[in-house]
């Protein structure tokens, strides 16, 4: 599905810092400016040079909380969660899609997501893409033990699914320190059994424990020993799980 021509015509562009609170601030400000029917939204990660008629929005946490509260009250917490999920998409138009869908939902109800409305349709598709990639990584993500006993894993997702993965493993590994490194975005999330911290790092220094090195070799040996060469089917493997997701598997596929 493609946006109609009016989508690309000259219209105010709201430029923000790329954070979810920043996007919520845009929703508040654009509504106050009565520009909610025709606007574009860009984050600083997508656009480095401002044009003459761009509107730069500073993140306002109080306005963001008001928008959150209003969405939960007039729509639902589930709708807000869908916004958060869509926000993790790598699609460069996600910001504009979310904002327009929110405005329409506030007028017509969250049932708009079940319609063929262009923005709602695109938002649903982005949500499905994010959740699908998260599901794939839940199946292939491999933790390895570092010398300090922290469990470490590396991912290279297309979408920014690190926050969604952290919430899952935090519930599963409550008493275990772990870190997940998003190599694509040079971002790492660290859980110390109490809280999660997310920060940026280009290349973390890693030292595996002696036990990890031993078990990794044992696992590779086991994986090879149970494999029946005559029955290998790489095409079927790639059909079930694209090779893109094999990069950081301990075993040799």
Give the positions of each predicted feature.
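Short, hydrophobic/amphipathic alpha-helical patches that form generic packing surfaces
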Residues: 22-33, 100-104, 167-171, 216-224
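Charged, alpha-helical interface segments at or near domain boundaries
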Residues: 41-135
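Acidic, Ser/Thr-rich peripheral helices and adjacent loops at domain boundaries
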Residues: 57-63, 196-208
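Long, compositionally biased intrinsically disordered terminal regions
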Residues: 177, 188-189, 207-253
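Internal, well-folded beta-alpha domain core
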Residues: 111-200
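N-terminal ordered "arm"
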Residues: 2-61
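Intrinsically disordered or highly flexible coil/loop and linker segments, enriched in small
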Residues: 37, 77-80, 136, 175-179, ...
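Short coil/turn segments at secondary-structure boundaries
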Residues: 82-86, 183-184, 232-238
